[in-house]
């Protein structure tokens, strides 16, 4: 029965111990039913004629004005999901109370009250109140901090609005929560769909709907109004839904639903109680908590049986066992975890690192492999157009002008290469090209083709398709080349020439993009991917992206911190190897994407662990490498900012992106860097390890202290004719000890504890308990002997003196263990605790010594200790600290120290 109760309780512990932002991406939405009325509404919107759409939403092609926006927002509310709305304070208070430890204490308190032990019930109630209120305060602070941090990296949408009283309109970038039904927005590759939308115009628009349907392949969307073949709105060509992402193409669409009224919003409301799979951090906390609770559930009955059998007073034995159970309950664990993580998140924000999910901090500190892209991480992210040449390597204005037309007229996601082409073309040429050539159509970029095309016209008779992209992908659709002004077949001789020229450019560290063209008769209708065939290779544009000055020292710092850096790039292996060499990273054997496709999972996992540089990768290659590294037991971080990085960001233990990343990358990430730099990342890793170290201190102290206390209680219960300490004493001792732990999140951490990755190790915790728990028992038994034979407190009439003596020793030794276990060094000499922790422990020790002498002593059934007791007290504490230090030295040499 007990096992079933606590199994249910513990199941909800991880989410209660850690404040997690209720992000919609975390919800499990597949196969969840929405109201029939919503399905009918969506199907109606899917086929509604455009003219009727304008009337339905009281909008117009020029966009909404400010008054219309405010009216729509008043009617429909903000574009936020219900889960994102703040809960009332009393809901937060209940959530902070509702953890297994507080529930357990409440049960014990109720038993005490029922047995008329009112003082014990009051002390237990006070402990629950302190734990709940401290946790509530820390949750409120962490929520406030998380909201402030999220506001720094909010996603935006491009919307068409009327911008002045004259009725002039323009495209504005606004936060997505400001969208209202009737807004017209632009979509491009990499965008998160910010609301439910009806497509008005689309060009090769492909959307990933896995968050709603579970289907991994993207689906094509279009502006057709034909009757849908299915009754499922998700299969309608004209509708896009909040929470999905644009994989490729462009579109304009009207917002038809926002917030809770969206398909995703309805699903989110119905799955808010569903349990998501706990991550490594939550599993670690859960295992530790379950271990401590099971330990208490086993030992409390044992104490009851021994005391009841030896003393004959089963009622008193039951009260004592109850107090032991309270003492073994680590009710401050939720508060310690929450406050430590929240403090870590705030400190990380000062290092330009924004934490989206608080429990990601532990994975940050545990990370031992960092996979990252090359561009903007190792390099300056300021790409410069260095060369524009024909296939022989001679400068060619024709190639530059073709590249300019492609970059200028494409409406998709303009990357740094496009910007470099536009900036690398002189203004006069740009004006001339813009006046002579008009855009007809475009075929947007996607990561399957790795190229994009625009169709332009200089006259009414012919169209010209201009295509640029990765060299191999362009060669795959070329049949001819322009060589010395003539069009010749693309044969083996030309291919060898092309390889020779491009390899030379790559070895110089230049990134090569191919440019090809095709002349076509003028025609009506859209151009498709099939038109990218029989192209003429015009030449290449080559870009320079020099390494950052901070990259080399950052890589050295990461290596010194025990983190292996691996480069996963879609770029050429020659360019990537050149950059690696310049920043002091030994690339060694380079693995390219085509090689990966021929390897089994086991072969690739083996290769991934010993390989530093992977080149010419697709998004799926990156995701597979990250997944296999995790399978081999590594804690893997992935840093990326592009659409192609999103799968790997989700697969990694910790996804890291930057503030300027595309929406889908920022949404997939756990950590957002305000500055795209490995040096900033290294500082964040150190702070993550510091945060984890402080959490681990409390867990180790609690586990070892509880383990030792139980041994002491069992020995005393078996051999003493009276209780070694009254239930009341145990409760007060536990309460004072809890107060001393409040400052642990603010403690200092030794340098050696942050020099290597830190991760949960349940085996180490069990070993730690066995080594350090019995130390306190040894000195507890010495105290028993001292009080029995030296002070002759060996009869029921003198038991108050005995209990007072052990009360003081127990409280002081339990408080001092904080300073002994917080460091592997010699405490107070080689390593000092932070001043808040020092102050709290000193106050608790003074209170503990003073209680037997205070007016409360008689009420607490304590008595003043003789002055001759205190030299013995000093000797016992000194011996305790000395032995602990000796055992600590042996333990750290043999097993290491977390």
From Swiss-Prot:
It comes from the Bacteria. It catalyses: Mg(2+)(out) + ATP + H2O = Mg(2+)(in) + ADP + phosphate + H(+). Pfam families: Cation_ATPase_C, Cation_ATPase_N, E1-E2_ATPase, Hydrolase. Signal peptide: none annotated. Induction: Induced by low levels of proline and by osmotic shock. The leader of mgtA mRNA functions as a riboswitch, favoring transcription under low Mg(2+) conditions. Under limiting proline levels the MgtL peptide encoded within the mgtA leader cannot be translated, thereby favoring the transcription of the mgtA ORF. Induction by osmotic shock also depends on translational regulation by MgtL. Induced by low extracellular levels of Mg(2+) via the PhoQ/PhoP two-component regulatory system. Belongs to the cation transport ATPase (P-type) (TC 3.A.3) family. Type IIIB subfamily. This is Magnesium-transporting ATPase, P-type 1. It comes from Escherichia coli (strain K12).
């Amino acid at each position: 029965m007990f096992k079933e109760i606590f199994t249910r309780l513990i199941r909800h512990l991880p989410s209660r111990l850690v404040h997690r932002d209720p992000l919609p991406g975390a919800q499990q939405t597949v196969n969840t039913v929405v109201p029939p009325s919503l399905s009918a509404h969506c199907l109606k919107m899917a086929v509604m004629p455009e003219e009727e759409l304008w009337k339905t939403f009281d909008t117009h092609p020029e966009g909404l004005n400010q008054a219309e926006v405010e009216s729509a927002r008043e009617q429909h509310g903000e574009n936020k999901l219900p889960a994102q709305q703040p809960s009332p304070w009393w809901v937060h208070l209940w959530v902070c109370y509702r953890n297994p430890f507080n529930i357990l204490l409440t049960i014990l308190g109720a038993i005490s009250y029922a047995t008329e032990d009112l003082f014990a019930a009051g002390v237990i109630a006070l402990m629950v109140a302190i734990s709940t209120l401290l946790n509530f305060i820390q949750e409120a602070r962490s929520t406030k901090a998380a909201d402030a941090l999220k506001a720094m990296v909010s996603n935006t949408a491009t919307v068409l609005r009327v911008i002045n009283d004259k009725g002039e309109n323009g495209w504005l970038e606004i936060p997505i929560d400001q969208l209202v039904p009737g807004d017209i927005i632009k979509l491009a590759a990499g965008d998160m769909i910010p609301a439910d939308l009806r497509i008005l115009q689309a060009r090769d628009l492909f959307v990933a709907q896995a968050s709603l349907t579970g289907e991994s392949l993207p689906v094509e969307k279009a502006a057709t109004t034909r009757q849908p073949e299915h009754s499922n709105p998700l299969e309608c060509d004209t509708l896009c839904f909040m929470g999905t992402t644009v994989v490729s193409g462009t579109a304009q669409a009207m917002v038809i639903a926002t917030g809770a009224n969206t398909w995703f919003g309805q699903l989110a409301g119905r799955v808010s109680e569903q349990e998501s799979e706990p991550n490594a951090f939550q599993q670690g906390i859960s295992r530790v908590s379950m271990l401590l609770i099971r330990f208490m559930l086993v030992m409390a009955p044992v104490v009851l049986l021994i005391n009841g059998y030896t003393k004959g007073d089963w009622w008193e034995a039951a009260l004592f066992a109850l107090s032991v159970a309270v003492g073994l309950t680590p009710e401050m664990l939720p508060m310690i975890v929450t406050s430590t993580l929240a403090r870590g998140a705030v400190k990380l924000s000062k290092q330009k690192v924004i934490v989206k999910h608080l429990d990601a901090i532990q994975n940050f500190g545990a990370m031992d492999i960092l996979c990252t892209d090359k561009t903007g991480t190792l390099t300056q992210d300021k790409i410069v157009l260095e060369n524009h040449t024909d296939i022989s390597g001679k400068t060619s204005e024709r190639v530059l002008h073709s590249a300019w037309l492609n970059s200028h007229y494409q409406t998709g996601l303009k990357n740094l290469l496009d910007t470099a082409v536009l900036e690398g073309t002189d203004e006069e040429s740009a004006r001339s090209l813009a006046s002579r050539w008009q855009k007809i159509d475009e075929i947007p970029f996607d990561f399957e083709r790795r190229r994009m095309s625009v169709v332009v016209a200089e006259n009414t008779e012919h169209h010209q398709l201009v295509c640029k992209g990765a060299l191999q992908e362009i060669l795959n659709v070329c049949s001819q080349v322009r060589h010395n002004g003539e069009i010749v077949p693309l044969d083996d001789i030309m291919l060898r020439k092309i390889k020779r020229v491009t390899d030379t450019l790559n070895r110089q560290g230049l990134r090569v993009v191919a440019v090809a063209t095709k002349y076509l008769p003028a025609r009506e209708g859209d151009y498709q991917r099939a038109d990218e065939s029989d192209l003429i290779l015009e030449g290449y544009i080559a870009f320079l992206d020099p390494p950052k000055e901070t990259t080399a020292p950052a890589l050295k710092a990461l290596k010194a911190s025990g983190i292996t850096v691996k480069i996963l790039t879609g770029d050429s292996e020659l360019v990537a190897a050149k950059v690696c060499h310049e920043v002091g990273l030994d690339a060694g054997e380079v693995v390219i994407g085509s090689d990966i496709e021929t390897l089994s999972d086991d072969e690739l996992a083996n290769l991934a662990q010993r390989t530093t540089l992977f080149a010419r990768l697709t998004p799926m290659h990156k995701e597979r490498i990250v997944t296999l590294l995790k399978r081999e037991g590594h804690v893997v971080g992935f840093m990326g900012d592009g659409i192609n990085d999103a799968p790997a960001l989700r697969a990694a233990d910790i996804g890291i992106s930057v503030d300027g990343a595309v929406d889908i990358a920022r949404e997939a990430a756990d950590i957002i860097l305000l500055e795209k730099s490995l040096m900033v990342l290294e500082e964040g890793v150190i702070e993550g390890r510091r945060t984890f170290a402080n959490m681990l201190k409390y867990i180790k102290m609690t586990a070892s202290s509880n383990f030792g206390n139980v041994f002491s209680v069992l020995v005393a219960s078996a051999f003493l004719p009276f209780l070694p300490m009254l239930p009341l004493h145990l409760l007060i001792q536990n309460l004072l000890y809890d107060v001393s732990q409040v400052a642990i999140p603010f403690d200092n951490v030794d340098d050696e504890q942050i020099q290597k990755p830190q991760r949960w190790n349940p085996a180490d915790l069990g070993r730690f308990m066995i080594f350090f728990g019995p130390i306190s028992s040894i000195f507890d038994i010495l105290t028993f002997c001292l009080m029995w034979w030296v002070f002759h407190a060996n009869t029921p009439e003198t038991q108050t003196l005995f209990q007072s003596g052990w009360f003081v020793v127990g409280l002081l030794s339990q408080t001092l263990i904080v300073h002994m276990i917080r460091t592997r060094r010699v405490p107070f000499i080689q390593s000092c605790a932070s001043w808040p922790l020092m102050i709290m422990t000193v106050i608790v020790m003074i209170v503990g010594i003073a209680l037997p002498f205070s007016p409360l002593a008689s009420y607490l059934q304590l008595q003043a200790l003789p002055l001759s007791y205190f030299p013995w007290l000093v000797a016992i504490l000194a011996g305790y600290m000395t032995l602990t230090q000796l055992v600590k030295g042996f333990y750290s040499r043999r097993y290491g120290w977390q």
